[in-house]
């Protein structure tokens, strides 16, 4: 049985899922949380919000001092991920090389509970840098011989969302016109990160059996309706304007020439229109957690008095 003072290590824990998970772990009384991440500004935000959490800079793609934190750890939640960008080697370093080193140190210290976070894109028809390296990552985890539940979430949103819906909401509040690619009727299965963190905690506390779990949002929502929901929740005044897909693609391509880490890439646009539909399992029943309705989750995301206004660096 996990004790509240047992060490929980979160590699890559200064991002969307990690910041939310820390908040919820602390709310449940856990006191020995270690976050390892290479995003310095987001580590600073975590230290400011959660001053009693040990948050250290670490490049997980290279061996280093960070590996000592796995000694005596009872739980490791593998959160590190390269999601966006145009440099393939960045995806390899953060999604593949870092995973290899973490698995090695988990084995070396015989950590009893590992919860790796994969992605629904592993089962996608898309073929991009993120999808390829997440497939490699998941294969490496399954071949490691470490029994663990592998979680495959769909597109997530919630507190601390610096990319995805969080970035879209901030962009929407800065511009008079918000462009929508094509007709905008691209089905999504958005997953509230608060629900996903409760699933992770269930894995930790209930020792969920090893296997692959597709964690999809239970509500199918078109991209344009997600944007409308964000506009309503934030009170943004931007006019939503549908523009031809090819023009939208060209503008993103042009943006990528001047920004080495653009918020939205042509590869991500192609994935948006791929029309993937992911398996929906009974994760509320299987993990013993509640599902937050999409409309309520959007409201909590942008209007929570404690975390709704905290913005991570992109």
Feature map (PLM): residue ranges:
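Mid/C-terminal beta-alpha module of Rossmann-like enzyme folds, strongest
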Residues: 203-264, 278-281, 286-314
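Conserved glycine-rich Rossmann-like NAD(P)H-binding loop of the short-chain dehydrogenase/reductase
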Residues: 30-40
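Conserved beta-loop-beta element that borders a ligand/cofactor-binding pocket
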Residues: 139-159, 169
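Conserved Rossmann-fold NAD(P)-dependent oxidoreductase catalytic core, especially the SDR/UDP-sugar
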Residues: 91, 97-133, 144, 149
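N-terminal Rossmann NAD(P)H-binding glycine-rich loop of SDR-like oxidoreductase domains
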Residues: 8-28
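A conserved pocket-lining segment of Rossmann-fold NAD(P)-dependent short-chain dehydrogenase/reductase
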Residues: 170-191, 199-203, 207, 214-216
